[in-house]
Amino acid sequence: MTNKNAYAQSGVDVEAGYEVVERIKKHVARTERLGVMGALGGFGGMFDLTKLDVKEPVLVSGTDGVGTKLMLAIQYDKHDTIGQDCVAMCVNDIIAAGAEPLYFLDYIATGKNEPAKLEQVVAGVAEGCVQAGCGLIGGETAEMPGMYGEDDYDLAGFAVGIAEKYQIIDGSKVKEGDILLGLASSGIHSNGYSLVRRVFADVSGDALLPELNGRALKDVLLEPTRIYVQQVLPLVKAGLVNGIAHITGGGFIENVPRMFADNLAAEIEEDKIPVLPIFTALEKYGKIKHEEMFEIFNMGIGLVLAVSPDKVDSVCQLVDEEVYTIGRIIAKEDKSVVIK
């Protein structure tokens, strides 16, 4: 073993790593926004907060991955949207606190650097950043042979946003009588996939299940998580929203109560939720109890807003899509979420 190729013989291809960096530069460039400083490749990403017109700035951060949805991306060899999922999981969490996403960093760990595949992953991250209006200012791609199989990789991200202190959404403004408005999800999003994979373990990704309206199963399962920043940020800045819940792991039951005080509860009208076909299929083929579906999945609503009754019309006018009135805030008697 010579010094020149010792690292390569141990399973780490430095040249492939350099190629990945070159390939992703054009995708990172798409995400440039006001405040981003420096170029890709520095030791740290930089952002100039003085460029922003914020009088009492509060930084809000979030980090997340995409769970075992990543295993389906690997199984179906489709890597161009999983990065958007990662961005969505982070920025949707910080917009729930009323923060505008500023910048994002990603972390990819893999058993073998495959430049073309990793470029697809980062292209998806960049697309998510464009949709969220945040800059992709850094990241890490770690080649770890022995830790991961050659075809395997993991993906995580970290987002930082900013809000005016008085506009922070922390649950303190939600009150009894507030109306619950829902924004539609694009699909399963990025939670519950260990169950999803079990339910469809013996079904081909190309299968055309009757419930899915002609779409291949793999396309439905890998539908990227929706990013809500463009719809919700104007509502926050206009002071129209009292609370926001991002419906992730734990479904309605775990996430909706995170946006209000312990003495309140959410009363949700099930028939007002636009249940997506994939959830009907999951319940049917997985033989999942109907009430349990609301403890796991978003069921067709990815974001829930708590809004004062006199501001509902303004919210609906400002959001350029259908808004679903799915319930209201009530005084808590027993459960934190009551589904009628």
UniProtKB/Swiss-Prot annotation:
GO terms for molecular function: ATP binding; phosphoribosylamine-glycine ligase activity; phosphoribosylformylglycinamidine cyclo-ligase activity. It comes from the Bacteria. Its EC number is 6.3.3.1. It is found in: Cytoplasm. Its main location: cytoplasm. Pfam families: AIRS, AIRS_C. The keyword Chaperone does not apply. Pathway: Purine metabolism; IMP biosynthesis via de novo pathway; 5-amino-1-(5-phospho-D-ribosyl)imidazole from N(2)-formyl-N(1)-(5-phospho-D-ribosyl)glycinamide: step 2/2. GO terms for cellular component: cytosol. Keywords: ATP-binding, Cytoplasm, Ligase, Nucleotide-binding, Purine biosynthesis. It catalyses: 2-formamido-N(1)-(5-O-phospho-beta-D-ribosyl)acetamidine + ATP = 5-amino-1-(5-phospho-beta-D-ribosyl)imidazole + ADP + phosphate + H(+). GO terms for biological process: 'de novo' IMP biosynthetic process; adenine biosynthetic process. The keyword Nucleotide-binding applies. Coiled coil: none annotated. Belongs to the AIR synthase family. This is Phosphoribosylformylglycinamidine cyclo-ligase. It comes from Streptococcus suis. The gene is purM.
